[in-house]
Amino acid sequence: MISMNPIMIRNNLSRSSSPAAPPTTNHSSTVDYFSIKPKLSLDTNSQSDSNSTQSNNNEDTHSEQSDYNSYTHNQYYDSDDDEDDFDIRDQLLDPFDKITLSNCNEEYYSPLTPFDGQTTSPQDSIISSKSSNKSTTVVPSPQFQLTLPKLTTYSFLIVDDNIINLKILNRILLKLFPKCHIVQIQDSKLVKDLLHKQSFDSIFIDIEMPDVNGIDIAQFVRQDTKFDNMGMVAVTTRNSTQDLELFKQCGIDFTFHKPLNYSLDFMANSIDDIIITRKNKI
């Protein structure tokens, strides 16, 4: 048997006599800084976000209000600036816009030039300006001389050994007399036979040609009286005084010098005069 001392017996009795305490569950756990840090940071962030949102809203409202105030302020001062500009403009233009005379009751307005009382009166200056405007010098338009073609139905014979000279003279004659009839001969040996077969109002001959030159043709024409009513014109580069005298002795009526730098009127009138003079001799 186990022996128990009085102290142990007393302790056992006290334990058995006292009611059993209900078992307690310890729900508290060990809590440290690292476990609560995430929670604290989340709470802090949410609070700062709400504060920042509120501050942003306040700033936007304040910005809109300041923009509106700035706009109204600018509008107000812009209108004031415009009024000031108009006032300054009026002050600058008034002395030049309205001019009065001390000894006259009338008012004269000169928007361009100020009035000088020592030289002329405003009334005289206005009258002189009006008269100068009315009496502007009218420059006459240049007079162009229009050459009208002659519609006479002439018949011409052109004799030249150079085909280019033939074409040039042919073109000029058609400009002068659009209804004329022209025969061109490059071989001067054919002229005599053609003159016996066909009549012409005038013949245009070159002087320097091979075989039969212009002097030979002129002498042949003037020896036959039936050609007296036909005009004869020399078209040549020979224009000395001796040559012109020789042409006249051979019965050539007129000489055009090459190149043909004559006005159309001069050539047309010269040809008309030659033909009319020859026809009137008969």
UniProtKB/Swiss-Prot annotation:
Domain Response regulatory: 155-273
Gene3D superfamilies tied to this protein: 3.40.50.2300
Residue ranges, compositional bias (Low complexity): 12-30, 41-58, 125-139
InterPro entries: Bact_response_regulator (IPR050595), CheY-like_superfamily (IPR011006), Sig_transdc_resp-reg_receiver (IPR001789)
Composition bias type Polar residues, residue spans: 66-77
Alphabetically ordered keywords of this record: Phosphoprotein
Protein name (record): Stress response regulator protein 1
